[in-house]
Amino acid sequence: MSIKCTTDISKLFAKIDAKTEEAKASYTEAFEMACRDIVNLAKRTNTYKDKTNNLRSSIGFILYDRGEFVTEKFDMAGIGVEGDGSKGIVEGKRIAEEAAKTHPEALIGVIVAGMEYALYVEAKGYDVLTGSCLQAKTVLEKYIKAL
């Protein structure tokens, strides 16, 4: 007695591909939402004065999937009176894009404080980005569990 397969294999693979794409889209959305939350938290953290608004405006993220741009969030922020933060946005995007392109084989979210002096501000004891990024795993897990 022989067994004969009557299933259309191409339809089976089409369903598998559709489910794979659905899962990928869900994980990409979870990454995006987690990055947005972390960036928003970092921008709301008020431990330093940003006279030019460049440092706070340089905080943002970029998301790439296998080398392809997905989304980003960089916007003007701060209440300083010596600038509008536009330089911060440009620098933040530049640094994030450079970092994201080093991993063209993966889904990658890069969160940055793009001004060159961000590390020095943190070294003085002010929280620019580190405190928010320490919550990244918890925030991402929250969105993944909601899938």
Which residues are covered by each model-predicted region?
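Short, intrinsically disordered N-terminal pre-domain segments
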Residues: 1-15
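Short, low-complexity, charged/polar segments at coil/turn and helix-coil boundaries
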Residues: 14, 18-118
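Protruding loop/beta-arch "assembly-hinge" segments enriched in small, turn-prone residues
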Residues: 122-147
